[in-house]
């Protein structure tokens, strides 16, 4: 790092931060610094994978922190729809969101994204949509560009190499505090006490930094609203059971409202021919899924998440989600895996019982156990209702052999009060991406970064 003062300081090198920087570099006279608490993309390594052991509890977790953010090692799905992956249409016109999503997608293509797009077979999708409706499921059609984990990291590396020639990037640097004077952002202080001044500060810490951002917002008296808490399991089935759906739309976005509690349940992050993985955040192990273009398994995995909207006086949805994940850690030392058949019989899965399953677990480190000791009844019953409904359009999903991994929790629960240009009530302090609670995926997070950058450039041009 060459200087102590910048035009723009970006906190977080996930898609929101990266695309903010990419847009800002279109003007040669803007000095930009990206600060990232994790490693650069080439050095991000999960020891659990490289050493074939259990989770090493690295801090920060290489799976969710570092250049590229939590999505760097995902299977890289770009949902090219305004209805999926965020709430940007709450801030700007939906047509404008669609235009910016197309713009962001074009940038991914420039850096090497695959040109193939799923979800274009309208006739087949309409048939599936009708069948889903009869099963009391809502299929949300969306066009998806699938990068694959290998291609996703390759694209992120190209973006990093490009930006290194344009801006300053500092990895392994955790921000302690956003500095404010007279209700105006003026810079940041790192955990090592280094103070860096900036005319604009952009907070994009991702899911891993959502709690930190909430704490900062509270200090600055920025209003916070709670998003629903999403808690559930990662489901693993034979790939053939989901093949019809994944061939047509790649990722089936299905929504269901439970009969018993009227809770919203949804599928999330479907990974055809993928593998289940552990991710680690703030001392807690949870579960996720990846899929690769080159390396395929015989299974498909996806999350089933139950959304809960808490009301007054409860204000700690993130703590609630972490508490449930921590219960699984206490019982198993990490992630629990259970056959659906064992859950129905009211018994735990054992290593021996898992050998009777036709589904071979892809997360070898998961401990056979009993999820009914972890998940609240309301959440567990919602998951089972959802799987029964899905079985009507994908026979084989609700099978005694189906594997359930727990738990999966999404930590994007606090939504900051933002203007239409994603600025907080603190002047020149912007927030965007998953960490700010306004996006939930790669493409809308990327788009949110473009919105912020365009506003900063507009203000700079106005001052000239």
Name these PLM-found stretches.
Residues 66-118:
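Dinucleotide-binding Rossmann-like beta1-alpha1 core, especially the glycine-rich loop
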Residues 2-85, 123-464:
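Residues forming the flavin
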